[in-house]
């Protein structure tokens, strides 16, 4: 299997006028995408940055993010996602951990870059995206494009790397090391319309992309979450590999009206989102527009995919009331995409929450290494042997823990616990690292959150444990409610008790104006724990 850049170059040659990237209402063809990226690659090469050198992407969504990534791939360098919410210490840690030699950064983040550059001894090239005053020692992205001819194409390898830094739930961010060839295996679903497996050569991949274009089956996806997040990052690589197009939104905070306008303008076929943080405002905007007699045009949209967090049955049902769509609820992580899925095709009665069909290469394994039998009631961790990264960069201990070899088979086991039902489906319980131990019972926050969020007055919720002399820990729900909601704490707890066992229900309801989430829509349990401690005085 080849490097992504080699495939994308072939696609650009084969379908040069097709759309490759869109940002808001603007778009770039494959010809433009390849040419601009090749010029950036020339600048990287001129700075002496090449094979296995790390390139940080401290950027918001936009053309520049995808071009910088393509450019790094072209030179066999390793692009590294950098969370744009990181402040100086977090930024310095990641850049030094990665041994980053180049950094693309947004102009609004220049002050943070200035604060850390002297702490990053390997950093030798800084490229500023956006107008405004240029950071001393940096170069403007647009000047870089204008001053370089496209870099010549070179031989590459499928063993070249892509780094996906994951914050996880505890500790410093870690880079998951993905060889291009391994990650390409996860694109299987995008080749199903052709009835073929994932191509393993540039020629086969380009031929498949051309056939998808000829049959009008090319995927045009809107990456709703930031590209620096695993969901958008991985799906964008997969879609571009098939000759499709990736669209992003220009607003720095999520704007559902803008999303639906971009879907209609570019005739997008797929949305990639992250659960309820996206679904709720999207549905509210659909309802508003419909009530105003100006419904959004969903005619091109075929599928909505969510990954990374739980996606409620209620939201799925409401989407299906607007259009008969395919709803794909995928179970995966930065370390293990495609562990399972829950598919709903146009029938609201099928919509479920947190119940998934296991992928062909995924099993549930107990902590002592046994495979969980269906209907046994045992809990185990999801283990995927199909698509497995090399490990974590500079962390052999964590690599050995997360990617063990069991009975001669290497698995990716990030830590998501589940039970296996009699019919072979799994019920996701949550990540073990944030589980709550109350009276000897292990309680997973996602279970409790989903029970509470099923109440119409609850906007969002995080559940955390607080210390307790009798029980060890208690369950505490930090939640936000709809304006004007008058429901009592006791009624909320009673509602949760209709969905989950009594011992899992919250001891305390802690009300906040809004629940803080990351830009990728994922729960910020550090914030939730601190908030719960401040409200209760317990720590």
Task: Mark where each language-model region is.
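Conserved AMP-binding/adenylate-forming core of the ANL superfamily
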Residues: 19-62, 66, 70, 87-92
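Structural core segment of the AMP-binding/adenylate-forming
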Residues: 46-47, 77-143
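AMP-binding/adenylate-forming catalytic core of the ANL superfamily
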Residues: 86-93, 103-105, 384-385, 390-394, ...
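AMP-binding/adenylate-forming catalytic domain of the ANL superfamily
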Residues: 129, 501-523
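Conserved pre-ATP/AMP-binding loop-to-beta segment of ANL
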Residues: 148-167, 171-172, 198, 211-221
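Conserved AMP-binding/adenylation subdomain of ANL enzymes
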Residues: 184-224, 228-272, 285, 289-290
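Gly/Ser/Thr-rich phosphate-binding loop
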Residues: 241-244, 268-273, 283-350, 361-363, ...
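Conserved beta-loop-beta connector loops within the AMP-binding
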Residues: 363-385, 419-423, 485-489, 523-525
């Amino acid at each position: 299997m080849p490097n992504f850049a080699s495939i994308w170059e072939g696609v650009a040659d084969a379908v040069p006028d097709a759309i490759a990237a869109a940002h808001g209402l603007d778009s770039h063809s494959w010809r433009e995408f390849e040419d601009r990226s090749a010029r950036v690659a020339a600048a990287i090469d001129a700075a002496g940055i090449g094979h296995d050198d790390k390139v940080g992407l401290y950027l918001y969504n936009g053309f520049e993010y995808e071009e910088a990534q393509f450019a790094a791939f072209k030179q066999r360098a390793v692009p590294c996602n950098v969370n744009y919410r990181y402040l100086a210490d977090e930024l310095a840690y990641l850049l030094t951990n990665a041994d980053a030699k180049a950094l693309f950064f947004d102009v609004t983040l220049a002050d943070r870059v200035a604060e850390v550059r002297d702490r990053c001894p390997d950093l030798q090239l800084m490229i500023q995206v956006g107008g405004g005053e240029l950071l001393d020692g940096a170069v403007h992205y647009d000047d870089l494009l204008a001053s370089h001819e496209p870099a010549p194409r070179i031989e590459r390898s499928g063993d070249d790397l892509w780094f996906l830094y994951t914050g996880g739930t505890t500790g410093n961010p870690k880079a998951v090391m993905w060889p291009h060839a391994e990650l390409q295996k996860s694109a299987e679903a995008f080749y199903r319309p052709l009835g073929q497996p994932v191509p393993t050569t540039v020629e086969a991949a380009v031929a498949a992309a051309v056939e998808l274009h000829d049959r009008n089956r090319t995927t045009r996806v809107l990456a709703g979450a930031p590209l620096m997040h695993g969901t958008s990052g991985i799906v964008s690589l997969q879609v571009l590999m098939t000759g499709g197009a990736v669209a992003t939104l220009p607003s720095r905070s999520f704007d559902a009206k803008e999303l639906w306008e971009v879907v209609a303008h570019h005739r997008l076929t797929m949305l990639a989102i992250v659960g309820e943080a996206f679904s709720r405002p999207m549905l509210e905007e659909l309802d508003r527009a419909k009530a105003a007699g100006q419904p959004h045009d969903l005619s091109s949209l075929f599928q909505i995919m969510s990954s990374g967090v739980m996606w409620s049955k209620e939201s799925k049902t409401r989407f299906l009331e607007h259009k008969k769509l395919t709803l794909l609820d995928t179970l995966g992580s930065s370390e293990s995409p495609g562990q399972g899925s829950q598919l709903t095709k146009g029938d609201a009665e099928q919509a479920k929450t947190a119940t998934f069909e296991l992928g062909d290469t995924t099993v549930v394994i107990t902590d002592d290494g046994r495979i969980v039998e269906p209907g046994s009631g045992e809990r185990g961790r999801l283990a995927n042997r199909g698509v497995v990264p090399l490990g974590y960069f500079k962390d052999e201990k964590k690599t050995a823990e997360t990617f063990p070899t069991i009975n001669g088979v290497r698995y990716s086991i990030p830590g998501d616990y589940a039970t296996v039902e009699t019919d072979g489906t799994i019920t996701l319980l949550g990540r073990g690292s944030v589980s709550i131990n109350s009276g000897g019972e292990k309680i997973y926050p996602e279970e409790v959150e989903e029970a509470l969020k099923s109440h119409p007055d609850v906007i969002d919720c995080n559940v955390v444990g607080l210390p307790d002399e009798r029980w060890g820990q208690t369950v505490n729900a930090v939640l936000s409610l709809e304006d004007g909601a008058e429901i009592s704490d006791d009624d909320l707890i009673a509602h949760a008790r209709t969905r989950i066992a009594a011992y899992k229900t919250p001891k305390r309801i802690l009300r906040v104006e809004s629940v803080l989430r990351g830009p990728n829509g994922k729960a910020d349990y550090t914030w939730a724990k601190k908030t719960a401690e401040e409200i209760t005085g317990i720590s």
